[in-house]
Amino acid sequence: MSRFAYTSIAILALFIGCSSEEQASLPASSGEKFSSGVHYEILDNPTTVRDPSKIEVTEVFWFGCNHCYALEPYIADWKKNVSSDVAFIKSPATWNEMLKKHASIYYTAKALGIEQQFVPAAFNTIQNEGRMLTGNTELEYFFRGFNVDKNKYKAVSTSFGVRNAVDQADKKMKQWQ
């Protein structure tokens, strides 16, 4: 398993393990300082950030990941109170073809302006209904539930903008490995 996968699992375990507000705030409330190698890792190849004046927090997710699904409500709550000097970025995982397909549908929804409604619905469909949302006909039907007709879905999902967004997410994933 790659170092990125171990780090991702450790971060997810930290969030899932912090199931109460009291537990989540222990390091800050106890005066403990965060330490490299204990609370975070310094990347060998530091990544660039969009705005150096902000703290960038990137959530790497996959609609098929039950841990990502379980984390969504906590992230939504956290985002409500996040400081103005924090930039939150949602980035789909892309390490295989199925994940790239799901990255494509995420960026399609984002381009169509339906990301807020789409993300919980996609998680629910995959996690609770067991439908993987990978076939074109299935996706056309799924997007119809957001008032997106088949032709609009096809045009946006195959657009340069969506393909480029998936490629950029994939480059970031490889940079973090």
Residue locations for each model-derived region?
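Extracytoplasmic thiol/disulfide redox context detector
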Residues: 4-97, 170
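Cysteine-centric redox/oxidoreductase cores and disulfide-bonded domains
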Residues: 95-177
